[in-house]
Each structure stands twice: as structure tokens, then as C-alpha cells.
């Protein structure tokens, strides 16, 4: 029987690209839980997208054995977490299942914005924090500066920081010993009533839902009937086990352990991430506190390219939702694109990942409309409505006022790029609320700005103007009054509802012009002239024209009378006019994608 005193549960958190997954690889490699032949980079990242982009999207739990220098055998359960701000909810879920957190600081970059936000997240859950300085093998590494920042910026004890190289494995032994001494063993007893937190789940096509749990009190074993305290569902446990990269069957899970349960759960909606599991026969008194439910901030409509694939797309979303608890979707329809779904995402990266997963894992060909945020509208009647879809936007005359969501953005930038970063924030309607010099080379700034402005190209432009050195983290704070307008896009005089966008009125002209220019490049030429117009209400504010393809009707006239030529040209003109009246323009999928990527180049 495993003694809880010999268990350590911790997660690995850091800013993007500071080396979380590489450190996980070294921890796994050092304990030799898998054969050297099967070693590869990013062992904890399962998805092809994660490997290709070199990012972590899903948190991944791993259990490794370790024999300490004092001869005792320990079991370490750790969770490798994502670094991107879009997936910070994954980090909060991992943190809720641990007693400690390894906070990695890159020796070449120092403390960045998500280093701070992840530390605050860990402190909120009373986690013990172990600072680790990574990438000490690089020529540009400055360990003393990193230690100073850990002391000064994070307020942690820099003497306790372990300097390692996750790439070469240097100093990994010292890190293992620090994990044992720094992190406390889990509390709880196997004799108490069962209390376990669901911190994740995934779908297995053969066995149903695999629930990831951290047992706080009591024990779970096959044959027991368990109850989900939030939803009230009861299930008989078929199998319990732990994660050693793959699922490894165990006889039971007891207080302090992290593992999985298979209980014949067939539908995704029955598993609430953050719910508490207890014994149906002897339930515990109260559920665990769980964690904040994640709210989507970016909305987009998704349509199948072929309208006959609607049912297949719905099934794909149901399966995707199981592995991605933060994705929300409901039915939607468009005159131009038929039936589809209105989806909520955590950010643009999340939207891109969902799009790629639909195409790769489920073989779906889909069209995404331009992303939008959730606006709060007050009607002249006094009624308040929430609108995230331009198609549902009421007539402007009926709206008394509109509010849009604002974010509190934390930016850390080298002083050389301070002017560039400030002018970008001002261009995006940001208002500076705080500015602190962390040291002579780095500045931390806080801005309040509309979420809609950050959606499109803010992150890309921030990275390019600061040569990749500035970092950015944000949280949604509140809604504030705004001057809102709906831009309709008309093609050949007909509005295309899927291309409509909601925008800040003073910048509506630029936005409409950009969309029209993009569409002009994407829509193939026809036999007749095609006007592309951007309009607010009945007022046209931008226009581009795709010129017609013309057959040379004068080719057969050699010399001859001008009236004969004129007659042929007039006849062609009449035919074109008639064609324009009945001609429909087919929009290629690339036209919708081009609108998604509308940027000031």
C-alpha cells in the first residue's frame, strides 16, 4: 500500500517557450519509465498540432517513480501545462489538483507576463512554489539576472531556485531532491468518505469517457458505485489506474493519488470538469470547491462546406467538446451558408486549434466566419440583450446604447521598444493605468483596452515591433459603453450575412475597405462586372469592383464599317446587362478565410 507521505503532486507552469515540455521530457527520461528507443521530444504532447507548432494545448498528467538520495521510494505525479493565455483555464485546473508548482524562468528572457500570472494563480490555491531557472546551457543565459528577477519581480526566495538545463539534463538530480524537500505530501486519509476532484477527461471510442481525478479523501476501486455531486449521475466503476504516459491499470486509487476512472460513461455532458466524485453508498458532506467555470470570449459561426455534412459536423463537435471542455456551441443558420453552429472560444489561438482539429481529426471541411466578441445592447424599450452574432444585431434605430467587453492587459517589454509598444496600445484604444520599471532594461505596463481590438492582430504586431521580446497577458474585466456599427458586405447588390461584422464606428470605414479589398483578390472574375460594397445601414462606405471578363467580339471584323462594330459591341453590352440581373456570384472558401485574416499589412 502506498504511503501518502511518499507522494508529491505538482504542476509545471511558465510563460510560453520557457521549456515546460522539455523539462517534463527530462524528468520522464531520468526515471527510465519508458525504453530509450521510444524517447522523442514533447513526450507529454499527444496531438500532432502540438508537436508541429511546438506548443502544449492540453495539460498532461504523468506518474513517475523516484528513489531519493536517502533511499526512500517516492511517487511523483506531475502535470505539464500550456503556456498560452488562451489556455490558462487548463493551468488553473492542473493547479487545483496539486500541492506544489514548479515555476520556470528562462535564463535568457527572464520573468515575463505569464510567469507572473501563473504565479498568482498558484498562490491563490496556496501552492508551494519552487522557482527553476532553465536554459543555463545557452550562451546568452544570465543566471544572476534571473535570480534578481525572481527576488525582485516575483518576491520568491532566489536562493531556493534550482538552475537547470532541460535540454542537456544538467542539474536534474538537484531538481528531483528539491521537489521532495520543497513540496508537502498530500493531506487526507483513505478511511474518510470518498472525495475526488475531476480535473479533466478524454474520450476513448471503445471504453467511453475516461475521467481524470485527484483523490483528496477515501479511495476508489472497481465495483464501487460513485456519484457526481453536481449532476447527480451515478455510475459503477469498471477500472481505475494511473498515468504513466499511457493509462496503467491499478487495483485502486487512494487519498493523495492522481489517476483515472472508467465507469461506462457514454455521454460527454454527464462529466462536469470541476465536479466532485463521492461514494454513492457513503457520500461525503460537501463537494470540493472546484474552480471557476471558463467563459468563452470570442465567437464565430462554423458551417460545413457541403450542407449535407451538417450531421457529421454536429457529431464532430460533440466528440471535440469532450476533450475540450471550454468549447461552447449552439445551432445557427445563414442564408448564404445554410445550417451551422455558433461557437464560443477562449481566444484566436483556440479558434485556430479547433479549426485544425476539425479538419485533421474529423476530416471536416468547414468555413469559419469573422470572430466577434459579446456586446451588451440596451434597447429603447429598456430591454437588455446580449449579441455576439452580427446576423442577430437589431436595427440601429431600436438601440439606445451599446457596451463592449474590456480587458486588463499586462505587458512586459524591454525599454528599447517602449515607444513602439505604447503607440500600438494607443492605436488599439488602450488607456494606460500603470507603468513600473522592473529594472533598467525592462518595463511592466498595465493597459485597459477593448477585447475586440486585441482579437485580430494585436499579438502578432506586438511580437514584430518588439522583435519577439515583449510579452502579453490579459484578463476580461467588465463591459463599457461603445459606439457600435454593423458593417454589411454586399456582393453584386446582395448582402452576405456570413460576411457581416460588428465594429467600432470610427474605424468601420477602414475595416470595410480592407474586407472589400481582400474579397476583390479572392472572388474569381465573371462574365459581368461585380461590385463589392461595405455598408452601414443604407449608406455605402466602401466599394471595390471586379471587372468583367470580355470576349473579343470584334475579332472577326477585319476593317469594315464602324457601325457594324458598334452593333456587335452594343449587343454584347445588352447580354452582359441581362447576365448581371440573373447572375449569382459563387464565393470560394478562401474568401471567408481572407476576411478572417484581415490585417493592415
From Swiss-Prot:
It holds the Pfam family GTP_EFTU_D2. Keywords: Cell inner membrane, Cell membrane, GTP-binding, Hydrolase, Membrane, Nucleotide-binding, Protein biosynthesis. Its EC number is 3.6.5.n1. The gene is lepA. It is found in: Cell inner membrane. One of its GO terms (molecular function) is ribosome binding. This is Elongation factor 4. HAMAP family: LepA. One of its GO terms (biological process) is positive regulation of translation. Coiled coil: none annotated. NCBIfam families: lepA, small_GTP. Transmembrane segments: none annotated. One of its GO terms (cellular component) is plasma membrane. InterPro entries: EF-4, EFG_II, EFG_III/V, EFG_V-like, EFTu-like_2, LepA_C_sf, LepA_CTD, LepA_IV. PROSITE patterns: G_TR_2 (PS51722). Its main location: membrane. It is a peripheral membrane protein. Residues 5-187 form the tr-type G domain. It comes from the Bacteria. Belongs to the TRAFAC class translation factor GTPase superfamily. Classic translation factor GTPase family. LepA subfamily. It catalyses: GTP + H2O = GDP + phosphate + H(+). It comes from Treponema denticola (strain ATCC 35405 / DSM 14222 / CIP 103919 / JCM 8153 / KCTC 15104). CDD domains: EF4_II, EF4_III, LepA, lepA_C. Required for accurate and efficient protein synthesis under certain stress conditions. May act as a fidelity factor of the translation reaction, by catalyzing a one-codon backward translocation of tRNAs on improperly translocated ribosomes. Back-translocation proceeds from a post-translocation (POST) complex to a pre-translocation (PRE) complex, thus giving elongation factor G a second chance to translocate the tRNAs correctly. Binds to ribosomes in a GTP-dependent manner.
